[in-house]
């Protein structure tokens, strides 16, 4: 784990920007990916609490904004395992200029992919887009697999299985147990109770989204800064508080501006949930994300939460799930890795010629 030593101040960062215009471009692109992540992944984290009408959509977005910020900052104190995995996943080589070009190429692809998915209201995974884009651009710069740390990539595959399988199964099991456990309870009181618990569960997912996705993209921002001064991320000493605030604020703005489209797709169109099912989905996703975060597995919040919602919905009646909407999402997930990897590779090759 990195020591929390602030070796670069905000004023020093502005000095780097003033002397390195390409760093300005790369940082703008990285903040663009964080913005898109806020509009898609962060919004998906609170979708079902709106779908069950436990919260108004504007109140849910405000809660998401606050919890994402707290999750990002708090988890940086507890564990940076996910950030370590992301920063160690690729090696752009010793030439910092080539490395910055590769990083710029990968972020352009991530933004383009994320915006396209957002236009259609499909909650794609910016986490997997980030991983694929970085890998594609690293392959382009290194000319082969030397630029990819396969040991860290294995963690991505483990995380992919965890996020979908564990999320779905946990959502299904908890949604099956609750009706049995509450069979003799007053229906109205139980409904009110699970409505309140669902809000708490959604807050937990938003916290873990900040912890997971916030670390991923914050480590990318630190990677850009490190490359601009010819260092590795580990040599930078840690995450300054100002970069945590910058990343969290950018994600929050993305959720506030673009979150409603994704919330409506997942929370209202994919499946209609009762409040206890919404709670089942939220608590399942929170547990899955926490396990992944502390073990350093870079998982997709989108995959985890959506799979949990599917499982909770199918537990009551498999026909209640709109499998047509699910198909759209799954196809987007499947194409994210090869699509963003190819875009990152092609753009890196193109940028190498131009710059």
Language model region names:
Residues 2-355:
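Multi-pass alpha-helical transmembrane bundle typical of ion/small-solute transporters
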């Amino acid at each position: 784990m990195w020591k929390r030593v602030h070796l670069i101040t905000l004023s020093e960062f502005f000095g780097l920007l003033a002397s390195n215009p390409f760093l300005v471009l790369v940082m703008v692109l990285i903040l663009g990916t964080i913005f898109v992540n806020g509009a898609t992944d962060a919004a998906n984290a609170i979708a079902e609490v709106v779908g069950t009408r436990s919260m108004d959509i504007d109140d849910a977005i405000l809660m998401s904004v606050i919890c994402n910020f707290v999750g990002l900052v708090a988890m940086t104190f507890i564990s940076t395992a996910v950030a370590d995995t992301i920063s160690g996943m690729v090696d752009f080589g010793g030439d910092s200029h080539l490395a910055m070009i590769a990083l710029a190429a990968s972020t352009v692809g991530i933004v383009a992919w994320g915006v396209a998915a957002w236009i259609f209201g499909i909650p794609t995974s910016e986490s997997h887009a980030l991983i694929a884009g970085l890998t594609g651009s690293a392959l382009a710069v290194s000319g082969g697999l030397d630029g990819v740390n396969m040991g860290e990539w294995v963690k991505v595959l483990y995380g992919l299985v965890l996020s979908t399988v564990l999320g779905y199964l946990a959502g299904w099991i908890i949604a099956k147990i609750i009706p049995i456990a509450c069979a003799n309870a007053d229906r109205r009181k139980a409904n009110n109770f699970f409505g309140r618990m669902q809000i708490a569960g959604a807050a937990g997912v938003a916290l873990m989204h900040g912890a997971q996705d916030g670390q991923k993209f914050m480590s990318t921002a630190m990677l850009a800064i490190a490359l601009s001064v010819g260092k590795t991320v580990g040599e930078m000493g840690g995450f300054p508080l100002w970069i945590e605030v910058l990343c969290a604020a950018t994600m929050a703005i993305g959720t506030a501006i673009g979150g409603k489209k994704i919330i409506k797709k997942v929370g209202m169109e994919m499946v209609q949930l009762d409040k206890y099912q919404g709670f089942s989905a939220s608590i399942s996703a929170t547990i899955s994300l926490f396990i992944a975060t502390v073990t350093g597995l870079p998982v997709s919040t989108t995959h985890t939460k959506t799979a949990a919602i599917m499982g909770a919905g199918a537990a009551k009646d498999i026909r209640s799930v709109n499998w047509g909407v699910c198909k759209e999402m799954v196809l987007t997930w499947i194409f994210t890795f090869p699509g963003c990897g190819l875009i990152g590779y092609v753009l890196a090759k193109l940028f190498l010629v131009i710059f």
